[in-house]
Each structure stands twice: as structure tokens, then as C-alpha cells.
Amino acid sequence: MKNLEHVCYNTRFSHIYVERRIRNHPRTEQILLRFPQAQIVEIEHYKDVFNRHGQDCVRQHQAQALILAEKTDHFFYEGAPVCQDFGNTNFYYCSTMMNCIYDCSYCYLKGMYPSGHMVLFVNIEDYLEELDHILKTQNMYVCISYDADLLAMEAVTGYVRLWSAYAAKHENLKLEIRTKCAGHAMWDLPCLSNVIYAFTLSPQKMIAVSYTHLTLPTNP
């Protein structure tokens, strides 16, 4: 039965939900080109899928769908006092993506979101425009990979490269990028003092017992 159940799952991103208002957005088109076999489903709002009641997040993660959407407000959130700000002032975080391709058993996202699917906001330029206004009056420490692993999705989004290019032009901005990704997307980016990559490295034993499911070990 377990084997039958396993093969019945769709592959990741075999279904992509797209908000109608951003269907013709250039980034939407670029992303869809990467998944030519995906079934595209147009929706009015990402919450129509993501916030439905009675979803099984565990099973959904076995066949994760991608939801392309537009973020319209609350681009940046103040970090809670209990969160690690590493001594920096004006600590914020933002979510250009919600949910993660990894499936770590201890992750708080499992209890935070009602869905196991992934939301990607395609209008990152609106985040940067909002940041332009804030940086005129204060410095900022922003965690941009707080509710997802941006680096793990870099081949699809290119967002880490965009954030890095923005940080290079704004000395009063410091970015933190948390990741468990073993990809090489960051290696050809310039080394910037105000862009911090925070890696989680897990030994094989941790992965073997599924604490950090789908991540790569530190040893072959």
C-alpha cells in the first residue's frame, strides 16, 4: 500500500495556480516556461487555494503545487523581539515566497500555514520600491528568506540575484538569507559585506531520520 501511495503522487509543481491579474506578468511567463508540462489553473486570488479549510499539509507537500500571486500590501514586517536580530537595529523580514520545498519535521511553517503548497509573489519590484522609501529615513536589517528558502528556488525565481544587486547600491541595508540549499547559484554573485548567507548544515544522521527531509547532507 505504501508503494502504491507513493507512485500516485504528482510531481512537484505539476500544477501551477496563477492569479488572473498577473497571468501576463513577465515574471509569470518566465516561470511558466520552466514548467512546460505543468497544468495551469487560473484563480482570482491565491487565498482561494492556499487558505482553504481542511487541507492536508503533509500529503500536499508530497505533490507540492506552485501558486503565482501578487503581493499588494504589508511588504515588510517588524521582527518580533524574541527573534534573532544579531544586535542589529530596525530588524524586519519579508516574504516574497511562502512555504518551502524542504520538509523539515521541526519547521514552524507546518503549523503556520493552512496549506502545504508554495506561494510565490511575482512583483518583487514593488517590495524594492517600498524599501526605497524606508531607507531614506533609516537603516534596515532584513531577513528575506524567513518563510521559505529563496536560494533553493533561485533557478526558478532569480530573486537572490535581484536582492544582491539591490543591496550593492544601498549601504544602509543589510540582508540575511537563510538556507539549507547546496546549490551553486550564489557563487557567481559579488561578495558583499551587507549580504549575509546563513547556512544550516545537517549531518547524514539527521536526514536519515527525516528531521531535515529533502535537504542534502554535509558528507557524500
Model-derived features with residue positions:
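Flexible, acidic/Gly-rich N-terminal and inter-domain linker regions that tether
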Residues: 1-90
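Conserved Radical SAM active-site core
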Residues: 60, 67-86, 105-198
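Surface-exposed cleft-lining segments at the edges of enzyme active sites
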Residues: 148, 205-211
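Conserved small/polar residues in nucleotide/adenosyl-binding loops
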Residues: 212-218
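Cysteine-centered iron-sulfur cluster-binding motifs in ferredoxin-type domains/subunits
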Residues: 94-104
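Short connector loops/turns at beta-strand edges and beta->alpha or beta->beta junctions
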Residues: 200-204
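Glycine-/small-residue-rich active-site loops that bind phosphorylated ligands and cofactors
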Residues: 23, 99, 151
